[in-house]
């Protein structure tokens, strides 16, 4: 019996506003427990929420970037449930009238394009955090940190259009890239700024009704999402094949074992007893505001990728790599302002710059070689001042010291040798030393030419102009 997976994702995006969604408390990560709270965060009687305008603006940005319709009127609702890290006894969210709906994202998996529907995007507040590890002076008891309570979130809910773990990861990566490009979230998955609930069910091929779904909560890495979904698909198929029934439930993924385990029964919407929050008036968004936000949107990764291919003539692979992060794309474009040859710039950014960043675990924004300095290095190559090989040595010194390339070349004596007399002298010495190889070359072993080039370059310590070396060497060997 063949089965097909049906997957829908609920993604929680923590917004990088300075203050919380309904109060003025800081959202800074890593502060002392319960040091960023107020009567609103703590759910004190009589404390009234005040909506953060920036949160609404960020929600509109997310909606426009994911092809959603922006509701001219939306309302906040109370989602009622009890949990120790929810001080009010309810979460302020949106239910019947979310701010964004009916969107989509297009993904590519193994060269095949697919459109994934987005049901809705709504604003809500985050809950606090339970700390179960040993706490000095407390022992084994669980502790509640309410610093995160009232932190602004967007919940982005997909349609059940995904059919594999690979599709789910492709969708998540694209969504993650968009929210980071927009600047509305840092997307830090380790800190919980971008986390996912995966709804998974399986159905027999040919069936017209979805199977019973489970929800795996708060998976916070692309790798773990893939593992959790693949495990859950296999588990559900095994249960059905053994004659059992899938229980609608909430499950947790254990990254250490790679399996999901039952957490609790899965609630339905009516279990939360949603009703409009009486402390918050309906949110009315004018067309003018939406258009102002639209005009302020940055160029999104898909549009940037296509522009790099169409206008700059870059291969698809280069365009994909360079647009992977907004910071990398900004660095590339800043370099182009000083050196208007896209392909060489792309090669160096993807090659030496990325290598150096990875070796030191640096961000591109912290690179000691600025775009202007990299452009100056490429100009030295174009002028014939240094060879491409020597340029890599110069780059390493620039990275270490922050010096300009011309300064490094001068200090290290790395100027390329193009004088034919000097190069010819080196060639003569090499050919005299390798007389046996010369005889073999002249007897028909043309592949030895590369060997001679290498010997000449080594003898010149990489300074000889490769073009001049090739020209003179060919004449000598054919003479």
UniProtKB/Swiss-Prot annotation:
Show the NCBIfam families listed in the entry: gatB (TIGR00133), PRK05477.1-2 (NF004012), PRK05477.1-4 (NF004014), PRK05477.1-5 (NF004015)
On subunit structure and binding partners, the annotation says:
Heterotrimer of A, B and C subunits.
In its UniProt entry, what is this protein called?
Aspartyl/glutamyl-tRNA(Asn/Gln) amidotransferase subunit B
A biological process from GO: glutaminyl-tRNAGln biosynthesis via transamidation
The organism's superkingdom is given as Bacteria
For this chain, the family text in UniProt reads: Belongs to the GatB/GatE family. GatB subfamily.
Tell me which stretches of the chain form a coiled coil. Answer: none
UniProtKB keywords: ATP-binding, Ligase, Nucleotide-binding, Protein biosynthesis
Functional summary from the UniProt entry: Allows the formation of correctly charged Asn-tRNA(Asn) or Gln-tRNA(Gln) through the transamidation of misacylated Asp-tRNA(Asn) or Glu-tRNA(Gln) in organisms which lack either or both of asparaginyl-tRNA or glutaminyl-tRNA synthetases. The reaction takes place in the presence of glutamine and ATP through an activated phospho-Asp-tRNA(Asn) or phospho-Glu-tRNA(Gln).
Which species is this UniProt entry from?
A: Geotalea daltonii (strain DSM 22248 / JCM 15807 / FRC-32) (Geobacter daltonii)
SUPFAM superfamilies annotated for this entry?
GatB/YqeY motif, Glutamine synthetase/guanido kinase
Its EC number(s): 6.3.5.-
Catalytic activity, as annotated? L-glutamyl-tRNA(Gln) + L-glutamine + ATP + H2O = L-glutaminyl-tRNA(Gln) + L-glutamate + ADP + phosphate + H(+); L-aspartyl-tRNA(Asn) + L-glutamine + ATP + H2O = L-asparaginyl-tRNA(Asn) + L-glutamate + ADP + phosphate + 2 H(+)
| GO MF terms, alphabetically ordered | asparaginyl-tRNA synthase (glutamine-hydrolyzing) activity; ATP binding; glutaminyl-tRNA synthase (glutamine-hydrolyzing) activity
**Family matches, as PANTHER family:** GLUTAMYL-TRNA GLN AMIDOTRANSFERASE SUBUNIT B MITOCHONDRIAL AND PROKARYOTIC PET112-RELATED, GLUTAMYL-TRNA(GLN) AMIDOTRANSFERASE SUBUNIT B, MITOCHONDRIAL
């Amino acid at each position: 019996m063949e089965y097909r997976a049906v997957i829908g994702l609920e993604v929680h995006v923590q917004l990088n506003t300075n203050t919380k969604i309904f109060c003025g408390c800081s959202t800074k990560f890593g502060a002392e427990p319960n040091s960023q709270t107020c009567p609103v965060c703590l759910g004190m009687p009589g404390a009234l929420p005040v909506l953060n305008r920036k949160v609404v603006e960020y929600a509109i940005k997310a909606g426009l970037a994911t092809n959603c319709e922006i509701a001219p009127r939306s309302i906040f609702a109370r989602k009622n449930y009890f949990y120790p890290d929810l001080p009010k006894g309810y979460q302020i969210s949106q239910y019947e009238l979310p701010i964004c709906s009916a969107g989509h994202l297009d993904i590519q998996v193994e060269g095949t394009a697919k459109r994934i529907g987005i049901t809705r995007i709504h604003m809500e507040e985050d809950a606090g955090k339970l700390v179960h590890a040993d706490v000095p002076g407390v022992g084994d008891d669980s502790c509640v940190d309410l610093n995160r309570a009232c932190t602004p979130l967007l919940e982005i809910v997909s349609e059940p259009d995904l059919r594999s773990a690979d599709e789910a990861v492709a969708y998540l990566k694209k969504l993650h890239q968009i929210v980071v490009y927009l600047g509305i979230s840092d997307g830090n998955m380790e800190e919980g700024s971008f986390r996912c609930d995966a709804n998974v069910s399986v159905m027999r091929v040919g069936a017209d009704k979805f199977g019973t779904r489970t929800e795996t909560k708060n998976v916070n890495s692309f790798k773990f999402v893939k593992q959790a979904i693949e495990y859950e698909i296999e588990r559900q198929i095994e249960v059905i094949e053994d004659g059992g029934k899938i229980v609608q439930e909430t499950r947790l993924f254990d990254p250490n074992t790679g399996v999901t385990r039952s957490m609790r029964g899965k609630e339905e919407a009516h279990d939360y007893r949603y009703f409009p929050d009486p402390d918050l008036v309906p949110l009315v968004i004018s067309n003018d505001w939406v258009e102002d936000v639209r005009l302020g949107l940055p160029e999104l990764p898909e549009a940037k990728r296509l522009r790099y291919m169409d206008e700059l003539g870059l291969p698809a692979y280069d365009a994909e790599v360079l647009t992977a992060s907004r910071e990398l794309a900004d660095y590339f474009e800043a370099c182009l302002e000083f050196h208007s040859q896209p392909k060489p710039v792309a090669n160096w950014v993807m090659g030496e710059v990325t290598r150096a960043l990875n070796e030191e675990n640096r961000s591109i924004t912290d690179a000691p070689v600025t775009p202007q300095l990299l452009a100056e290095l490429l100009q030295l190559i174009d002028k014939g001042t240094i060879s491409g090989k020597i340029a890599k040595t110069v780059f390493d010194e620039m990275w270490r010291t922050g010096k300009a390339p011309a300064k490094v070349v001068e200090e290290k004596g790395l100027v390329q040798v193009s004088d034919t007399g000097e190069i010819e002298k080196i060639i003569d010495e090499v050919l005299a030393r390798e007389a046996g190889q010369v005889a073999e070359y002249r007897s028909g072993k043309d592949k030895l030419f590369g060997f001679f080039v290498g010997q000449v370059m080594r003898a010149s310590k990489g300074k000889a102009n490769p073009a001049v070396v090739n020209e003179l060497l060919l004449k000598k060997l054919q003479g």
